[in-house]
Amino acid sequence: MIFKALTILLLVATVLGGSAYFVYDLYYKDKKLDLIEQTAPPTPVPSPTPDPSVAAWDELKPAAAKDTIEARESVKTFITTYPESVRLPEASAALGRMNLVLFRDTAATPANTVYAVKKGDSLAKIASLTKSNVEQIYWVNQLSSINLQIGQQLLIPSLNTSAVLIREKSTLIVFNHGEFFKEYPIVSLTLTGGASKGEFETKVADRVARKGETRVAFGAKDYAETVRFVLLSPGSVSIHPAPTPAADGTIPPNPPGIVLSLADFNDIFALLKTGTPVTIK
């Protein structure tokens, strides 16, 4: 009888003890672990590694503000060394500015030649003699008139350009003899058809200057009053300058195609002659 009672008590103790442990394991143990986690010091987060290109560009910026051959080489080295730098857009803009300035310097661009104007010369005649382009000679010499003076020194540019439009960045990049020349930000971009997707090859089909419905030749007295644009084909894409404000101050809407600031369009109109290849991607 006593043995039976002891056995029952032992079974009851076993059941109650197991239940107590189960409650502890299910509730109190988790609570204790939560408390430990809450009071434990946070796991230290490693500091991000500083981008060395930022410091390198900051050090180079004073030199990059100058338009010298040495400064240009330093910027080229930076771009080659840090092709993924967050400062790459700034460096590319500086390089483009330098290239444009130094292109008009025969010491910096020895491929360009100098021509001394002779009696009976005209821009058209000089362009024919030097196998150049009238508008490119006018542009590179920053002329304000087609009238020339005997003995006047004219720079004859060495240009063999191509262009790449990058949709995602909304930029038009010009290359000369296969090397980066300058990157131009696009003000407005509207592309359709094949030009709007994938990699699309086209070329300059025409460079147009019109006054009303009449086409005007370069050098004509009313050429400055014309509306100019560049036509690309295939793709029926056009390049335009941004519209100027109307007399009442309102700004007309941008035309479809590729729209650049007026200053940038003036460069592009001269740099991209008929037949120049353009890649859109």
Where are these regions (language model features)?
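N-terminal Sec-pathway targeting helices
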Residues: 1-15
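Hydrophobic single-pass membrane-insertion segments
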Residues: 17-35
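Alpha-helical solenoid scaffolds that mediate protein-protein interactions
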Residues: 39-42, 78, 82
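Primarily a LysM-type cell-wall glycan-binding module
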Residues: 45-69, 74, 102-131
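Extracellular LysM carbohydrate-binding repeats and other cell-envelope/extracellular binding modules
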Residues: 80-110, 133-166
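Loop/turn positions that initiate beta-strands
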Residues: 120, 151-154, 275
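Gly/Pro-biased beta-strand-loop elements
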Residues: 158-246
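Short beta-strand-centered segments at strand-helix junctions
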Residues: 215-219, 250-271
